Amino acid sequence: MFKQFSFAALLAVAALSTGCASVKMADDTQDAQAKTFQVSPDKAHIYVYRNESMGAGVKMPVALNGKPVGATVAKSYLMLSVPAGQQTLVSSAENDSELKLSAEAGKNYFVWQEVKVGFIKARNALQVVDEATGRAGVNESKLIQAQ
């Protein structure tokens, strides 16, 4: 019985780490521009990034203030330009992860979309990270075209 459970768990992990998810990527020029991290004085930028390979075959939709803005895959990120004020991000997988932040104009915010092993499919957690960590994560990822 234990061997059957172990085999099933191994298959689940393998399924979560491989697969064939695709999203529309931005071109190299847009990616390079986003990685300058320049923000206009009247807006804030929120970078939602997923820089790990875990769950590579799983798209994870992201919504900003109740509106879909895109879906991440492994080694990808979204750059969202928002007005100052309260912003709510929701990322969906086996679970929904919600993050509220108060954006200030002229600032960048970095949100790591951590992928975790779930019961049926991948789970996720949104976490605000410091600028150095966020820039490094974005720099090893590729820009997704926002919806």
Which residue ranges define each predicted feature?
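Sec-dependent bacterial lipoprotein signal peptides
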Residues: 1-21
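Short loop/turn and low-complexity linker motifs enriched in small/turn-promoting residues
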Residues: 20-147
